């Protein structure tokens, strides 16, 4: 938790890598994930860097592996994924691996090409057999005539044509037969009629079964056609039209004997093709199964090798071109591991001269490194979505672990809904090692990544549901109500007390639709409910009024405490960066302004709750009126909450008024005095540099990175650094804007926390409406079929509860909780202007196959 409170101390290290050991050293660093490399070749194009050839080789290997994975998936062969990630391949094995993969690719492409060719031939032969079978039905004559006109028996019997004319026509008859897509038949026929001007006779028949297209592989419906024409020119036109409509044209036999011979030959060839195709597929599957055993490790190895060469391209060579120089950011705590990794890489390469490192001082801002685990990672991502924390500033994620699910639960307070959410998150946590959860759809994967957030959100919702005493909009009476209805009846009290109290009798109960419990009557109110809200309020008509008052005050209290805590965290930042003047001139005035107004409001709320009981609540003054009178100084005196209230409030207002000019002018005037009193403004006593930032505070402290076990000490700052330009007007304007924003933000941010009350009220009302419209109707059915009606009612109630109250309302409360943390809480102390530490780590490479048959 210590590292989660503040980012780790970083140092800039210079690595000296021998050319022969650089690959092995970076492989060892990638396995450990210790350092973030700086690009020392920013001015060099990516195509002109030293190891661009090796990167292209890795990309070529990736292309081959993607092809292999696609073929393996196409063959429905499972891809084994190992639990342990294989190391990067040694350099001496890279060429061998490349040759193996290229040879395997050539073999697979050749076998696949032959298989596709065989399959295409087989489909064409099957189409040919279907065409012969169907066109045989077009022939209506059993006696063979001349082959050029045997398909037109009607020509002989036509009274308009004599036999000699038929012979002249028959001498020029021709036939085109084949198959055409079902959707193109109508257009094909119209085109033939218009182009050939009626000099064709077309016969169609639909195939009973769908066939696979040899070209596209799509299974579609086909029509067999037979076109009879006369004239060579008409024949050329018919063939061109068939080509335009992508018809599959096959030779048409002239005689029945020729048809039989072709049919027998086709059957033989089809059987032979089936045999050859099966053997080819078996061989292809054997090759793919053998390739599938090692493709996972090959993919990971190639990706690691490519990542290593990308990092090597960020290094520079020394003057002798025998040593690579790299600059890396490394946490102080990992320096020893970094040295051991370099030694390990040098030892594996067998180099005589080991690689080594050196710590170099720098004035640059280091990246922010915050160590997380699977529990804290989700909360850290919420903070980083707003902005990565500046180097060494307080990290809000440590406190967000508790405050975020708690504020969510305040808006989502329902025992039943929270318990359902808790069970769902618990199921994800218990099955977090299941491989399918990481490969699920994006929405489910998002739930899985935030499983611990959901777990705490559900757990805290159970707690707030107990406080609100809400379980699916109904109250639970666990300890017995603190209110006694029977004590209101006149029969419960002596006759002498009847005139002093407003009691009930049978007539009052019959003639009044609304009855009021009086806590001043003895025995009516026996004390507060042990846990949460008394269940009797669920029956009261003024329940909403009571809950609104309670939740509104609770929202204000939580909001002011949350914001005050943010200001206090800012003090830790000032102490760490040794800017104590910010504590006295910024943080303390901010705290005084906040506490003297809104802190006093919390005091009045708690004072009224503690001093005035249920019996004396009638005479309790209004907090709203008292708070308004605090600023108006009315002439008419009120009773007030306590003695001396007026003097206390005036003192608080005076302190508030005095804190505002200090907040506006204190820091700029102090910096002006500091500037005039020193010849060099850039350095303070601890060697921290004061640099002004444009978007944040004009002055912030950045430590000189002399952190190699205290060996480097900061000498005279005025001799080391140039003096910074001091602009008093800009500093004053920045501080004035910040002060105005803070003073107005105290009011607007406090009002913003009222969303806790608003969303809690909305959630409770939606739950109540859903219960009233479904469950209440189903439970009131007292017929013999009531049980049958109750089952679909419960099912519908469960579905609407999940989709409306859990998902939609939960998402709304989640977004509002994020806003309260980002805006109202973090702007009190969190700058969020840093850069995230992105280590060179092989663990960041995905080890799962994606839907595109690759590993991302």
Swiss-Prot record:
TM region(s), chain numbering: 394-412, 415-431, 446-475, 550-569, 588-608, 652-671, 740-764, 786-824
Keyword Membrane (UniProt): yes
Organism this protein belongs to: Homo sapiens (Human)
Cytoplasmic side: 1-393, 432-445, 570-587, 672-739, 825-856
Membrane topology: Multi-pass membrane protein
Subcellular compartments: Cell membrane; Endosome membrane
Disorder this protein is connected to according to its UniProt record: Cutis laxa, autosomal recessive, 2A: A disorder characterized by an excessive congenital skin wrinkling, a large fontanelle with delayed closure, a typical facial appearance with downslanting palpebral fissures, a general connective tissue weakness, and varying degrees of growth and developmental delay and neurological abnormalities. Some affected individuals develop seizures and mental deterioration later in life, whereas the skin phenotype tends to become milder with age. At the molecular level, an abnormal glycosylation of serum proteins is observed in many cases.
Protein name listed in UniProt: V-type proton ATPase 116 kDa subunit a 2
Physiological role: Subunit of the V0 complex of vacuolar(H+)-ATPase (V-ATPase), a multisubunit enzyme composed of a peripheral complex (V1) that hydrolyzes ATP and a membrane integral complex (V0) that translocates protons. V-ATPase is responsible for acidifying and maintaining the pH of intracellular compartments and in some cell types, is targeted to the plasma membrane, where it is responsible for acidifying the extracellular environment. Essential component of the endosomal pH-sensing machinery.
Keywords of this entry: Cell membrane, Endosome, Glycoprotein, Hydrogen ion transport, Ion transport, Membrane, Phosphoprotein, Transmembrane, Transmembrane helix, Transport
Quaternary state and interactors: V-ATPase is a heteromultimeric enzyme made up of two complexes: the ATP-hydrolytic V1 complex and the proton translocation V0 complex. The V1 complex consists of three catalytic AB heterodimers that form a heterohexamer, three peripheral stalks each consisting of EG heterodimers, one central rotor including subunits D and F, and the regulatory subunits C and H. The proton translocation complex V0 consists of the proton transport subunit a, a ring of proteolipid subunits c9c'', rotary subunit d, subunits e and f, and the accessory subunits ATP6AP1/Ac45 and ATP6AP2/PRR.
InterPro entries on file: V-ATPase_116kDa_su (IPR002490), V-type_ATPase_116kDa_su_euka (IPR026028)
One biological process term in Gene Ontology: immune response
A Pfam short name: V_ATPase_I
Similarity annotation: Belongs to the V-ATPase 116 kDa subunit family.
Spans within the Vacuolar topological domain: 413-414, 476-549, 609-651, 765-785
Residue positions, PTM Phosphoserine: 695, 700
GO CC aspect terms: acrosomal vesicle; endosome membrane; focal adhesion; Golgi membrane; intracellular membrane-bounded organelle; lysosomal membrane; perinuclear region of cytoplasm; phagocytic vesicle membrane
Entry-listed glycosylation sites: 484, 505
GO function terms (MF aspect): ATPase binding; proton-transporting ATPase activity, rotational mechanism
Disulfide bond among keywords: no
């Amino acid at each position: 938790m210590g590292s989660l409170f503040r980012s780790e101390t970083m140092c800039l290290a210079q690595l000296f890598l021998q050319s022969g050991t650089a690959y092995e050293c970076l492989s060892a660093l990638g396995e450990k994930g210790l350092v973030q490399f700086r690009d020392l070749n920013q001015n060099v194009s990516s195509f002109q860097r030293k190891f661009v050839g090796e990167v292209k080789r890795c990309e070529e290997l990736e292309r081959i592996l993607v092809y292999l994975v696609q073929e393996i998936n196409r063959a429905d062969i499972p891809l084994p994924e190992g639990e342990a990630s294989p190391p990067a391949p040694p350099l001496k094995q890279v060429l061998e691996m490349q040759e193996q993969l290229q040879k395997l690719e050539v073999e697979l492409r050749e076998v696949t090409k032959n298989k596709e060719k065989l399959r295409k031939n087989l489909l064409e032969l099957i189409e040919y057999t279907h065409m012969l079978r169907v066109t045989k039905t077009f022939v209506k004559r059993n006696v063979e005539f001349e082959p050029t006109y045997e398909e037109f028996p009607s020509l002989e019997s036509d009274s308009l044509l004599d036999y000699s004319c038929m012979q002249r026509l028959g001498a020029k008859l021709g036939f085109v037969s084949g198959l055409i897509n079902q959707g193109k038949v109508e257009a094909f026929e119209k085109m033939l009629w218009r182009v050939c001007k009626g000099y064709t006779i077309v016969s169609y028949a639909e195939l009973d079964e769908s066939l696979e297209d040899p070209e596209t592989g799509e299974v579609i419906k086909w029509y067999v056609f037979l076109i009879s024409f006369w004239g060579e020119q008409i024949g050329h036109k018919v063939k061109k039209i068939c080509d335009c409509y992508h018809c599959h044209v096959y030779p048409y036999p002239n005689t029945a004997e020729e048809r039989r011979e072709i049919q027998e030959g086709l059957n033989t060839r089809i059987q032979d093709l089936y045999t050859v195709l099966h053997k080819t597929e078996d061989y292809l599957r054997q090759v793919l199964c053998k390739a599938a055993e090692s493709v996972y490790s090959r993919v990971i190895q190639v990706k690691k090798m490519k990542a290593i060469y990308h990092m090597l391209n960020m290094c520079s060579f020394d003057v002798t071109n025998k040593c690579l120089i790299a600059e890396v950011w490394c946490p102080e705590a990992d320096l020893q591991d970094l040295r051991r990794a370099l030694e390990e890489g040098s030892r594996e390469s067998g180099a005589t001269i080991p690689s080594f490192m050196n710590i170099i001082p720098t004035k640059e801002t280091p990246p922010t490194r915050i160590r997380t685990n699977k529990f804290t990672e989700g909360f850290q991502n919420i903070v980083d979505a707003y902005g990565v924390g500046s180097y060494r500033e307080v990290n809000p994620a440590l406190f967000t672990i508790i405050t975020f699910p708690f504020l969510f639960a305040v808006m989502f307070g329902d025992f039943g809904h929270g318990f359902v959410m808790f069970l769902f998150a618990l199921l994800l946590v218990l099955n977090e090692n299941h491989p399918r959860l990481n490969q699920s759809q994006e929405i489910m994967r998002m739930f899985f990544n935030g499983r611990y957030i959901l777990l705490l959100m559900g757990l805290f919702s159970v707690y707030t549901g107990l406080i609100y005493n809400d379980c699916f909009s109904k109250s639970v009476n666990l300890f017995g109500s603190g209110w006694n209805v029977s004590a209101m009846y006149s029969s419960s009290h002596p006759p002498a007390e009847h005139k002093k109290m407003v009691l009930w009798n049978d007539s009052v109960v019959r003639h009044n639709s609304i009855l009021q419990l009086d806590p001043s009557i003895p025995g009516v109110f026996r004390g507060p409910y042990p846990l949460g809200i008394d269940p009797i309020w669920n029956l009261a008509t003024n329940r909403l009024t009571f809950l609104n008052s309670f939740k509104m005050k609770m929202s204000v209290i939580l909001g002011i405490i949350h914001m005050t805590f943010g200001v206090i965290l800012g003090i830790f930042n000032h102490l760490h960066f040794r800017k104590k003047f910010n504590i006295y001139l910024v943080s303390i005035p901010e705290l005084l302004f906040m506490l003297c107004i809104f802190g006093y409001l919390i005091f009045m709320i708690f004072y009224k709750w503690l001093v005035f009981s249920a019996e004396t609540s009638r005479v309790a003054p209004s907090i709203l009126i008292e708070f308004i009178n605090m600023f108006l100084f009315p002439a008419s005196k009120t009773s007030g909450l306590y003695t001396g209230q007026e003097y206390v409030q005036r003192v608080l207002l005076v302190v508030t008024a005095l804190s505002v000019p200090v907040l506006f002018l204190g820091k700029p005037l102090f910096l002006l005095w500091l500037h005039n009193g020193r010849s060099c403004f850039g350095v303070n006593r601890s060697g921290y540099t004061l640099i002004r930032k444009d978007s944040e505070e004009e002055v912030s402290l950045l430590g000189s990175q002399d952190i190699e076990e205290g060996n480097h000490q900061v000498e005279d700052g005025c001799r080391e650094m140039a003096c910074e330009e001091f602009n008093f007007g800009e500093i004053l304007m920045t501080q004035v804007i910040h002060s105005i924003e803070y003073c107005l933000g105290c009011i607007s941010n406090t009002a913003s926390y009222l969303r806790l009350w608003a969303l809690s009220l909305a959630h409770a009302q939606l739950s109540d409406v859903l219960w009233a419209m479904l469950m209440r109707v189903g439970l009131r059915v007292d017929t013999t079929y009531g049980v049958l009606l109750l089952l679909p009612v419960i099912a519908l109630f469960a579905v609407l509860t999940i989709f409306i109250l859990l998902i939609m309302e939960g998402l709304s409360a989640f977004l509002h909780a994020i806003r309260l943390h980002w805006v109202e809480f973090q702007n009190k102390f969190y700058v969020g202007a840093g850069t995230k530490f992105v280590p060179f780590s092989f663990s960041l490479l995905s080890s799962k196959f994606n839907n595109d048959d690759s590993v991302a």
